[in-house]
């Protein structure tokens, strides 16, 4: 089953909004074209960076439809399908059309803080409910619970359609255990732009990126250099991103990346509550950092 190739850089696409709060579909079309023109390896739609919890069912369907129509099977499309209600996730998988989708990204259940056995059972039933390739997503800073290496490996070994994990725990030792003991064909992806070089250095095959929304060509080049063993030149590019990494998350994601895209003239600086744009002081820092990055 493990057929989808996730090597390289996938980009977790933002959702642009107009000043009136509606989805800015023309801006979204532009962003997807921008990613394609700059050589990304795959797209992630309706993830955390997309502000998916604030999108209506109709908006989610239209966003996926639009992205599929623009991409036209040139690169894989991964759609976020997760939640803390196992039956609701299964219902979604059983009732919606995923015919043009290459894989799903499914987050560890959040808020209700399941045990490791609960996490295992959650993904077991999801894996049994679909033939789609599944990318596990471990992000304890958001979910409130960490999926251990042991649970991740158990799922990877038990279900052929669980093909990868986006690891955003920040725990390099834990991620290393997964990489060392994973079954053949199972792919480990960095869920953190800043840690991507370190994780590729121990065997990760790429990254699901936020900064790639802004700099797909430059960040993608860094990832490819690292994967091809040119760590020296990859580190040079990584160093150029240092301040931008900080600004991405200083007031939360996607506030930082949306501020950057606004400075570049791609989108309105608009988020949906309870998320808000970065403060003016941070916005000014973003402007200066982008100017410095462009002149390097």
Swiss-Prot record:
Keyword Electron transport: no
Catalytic activity of the protein: L-aspartate 4-semialdehyde + pyruvate = (2S,4S)-4-hydroxy-2,3,4,5-tetrahydrodipicolinate + H2O + H(+)
Any GO molecular function: 4-hydroxy-tetrahydrodipicolinate synthase activity
GO biological process, alphabetically ordered: diaminopimelate biosynthetic process; lysine biosynthetic process via diaminopimelate
Key words of the record: Amino-acid biosynthesis, Cytoplasm, Diaminopimelate biosynthesis, Lyase, Lysine biosynthesis, Schiff base
SUPFAM superfamilies: Aldolase
Role description: Catalyzes the condensation of (S)-aspartate-beta-semialdehyde [(S)-ASA] and pyruvate to 4-hydroxy-tetrahydrodipicolinate (HTPA).
InterPro entries hit by this protein: Aldolase_TIM, DapA, DapA-like, Schiff_base-form_aldolases_AS
Matches recorded under PROSITE patterns: DHDPS_2
NCBIfam families from the UniProt entry: dapA
Pathway the protein contributes to: Amino-acid biosynthesis; L-lysine biosynthesis via DAP pathway; (S)-tetrahydrodipicolinate from L-aspartate: step 3/4
UniProt keyword Transferase, yes or no: no
Domain of life: Bacteria
EC numbers: 4.3.3.7
Complexes and interactors: Homotetramer; dimer of dimers.
Record-linked Pfam families: DHDPS
Compartment list: Cytoplasm
Family: Belongs to the DapA family.
GO CC terms: cytosol
Protein name: 4-hydroxy-tetrahydrodipicolinate synthase
Catalytic-site annotation from UniProt: 137 (proton donor/acceptor), 166 (schiff-base intermediate with substrate)
Feature type site, description Part of a proton relay during catalysis: 48, 111
Record organism: Azobacteroides pseudotrichonymphae genomovar. CFP2
Chain positions recorded as pyruvate binding sites: 49, 208
């Amino acid at each position: 089953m493990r057929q989808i190739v996730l090597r390289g850089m996938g980009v977790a696409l933002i959702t642009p909004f107009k000043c009136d709060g509606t989805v800015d579909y023309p801006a979204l079309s532009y962003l997807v074209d921008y990613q394609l023109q700059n050589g990304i390896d795959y797209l992630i739609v309706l993830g955390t960076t997309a502000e998916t919890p604030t999108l209506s069912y109709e908006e989610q369907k239209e966003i996926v439809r639009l992205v599929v129509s623009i991409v036209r099977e040139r690169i894989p499309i991964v759609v976020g399908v997760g939640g803390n209600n196992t039956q609701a996730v299964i219902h979604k998988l059983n009732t919606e059309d995923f015919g043009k989708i290459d894989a799903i990204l499914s987050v560890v259940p959040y808020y209700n803080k399941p045990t490791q056995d609960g996490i295992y059972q959650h993904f077991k039933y999801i894996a049994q409910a679909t033939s789609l390739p599944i990318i596990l997503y471990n992000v304890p800073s958001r979910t409130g619970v960490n999926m251990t290496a042991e649970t991740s490996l158990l799922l990877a070994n038990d279900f052929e359609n669980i093909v990868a994990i986006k690891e955003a725990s920040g725990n390099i030792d834990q991620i290393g255990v997964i990489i060392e003991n994973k079954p053949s064909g199972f792919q480990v992806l960095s869920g953190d732009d800043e840690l991507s070089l370190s994780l590729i250095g121990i065997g990760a095959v790429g990254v699901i990126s936020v900064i790639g929304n802004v700099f797909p060509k430059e960040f993608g080049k860094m990832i490819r250099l690292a994967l091809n063993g040119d760590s020296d030149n990859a580190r040079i590019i990584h160093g150029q991103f240092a301040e931008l990494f900080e600004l991405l998350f200083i007031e939360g994601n996607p506030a930082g990346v949306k501020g950057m895209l606004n400075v570049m003239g791609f989108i309105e600086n608009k988020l949906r509550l309870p998320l808000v744009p970065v403060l003016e002081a941070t916005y000014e820092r973003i402007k200066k950092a982008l100017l410095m990055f462009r002149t390097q």
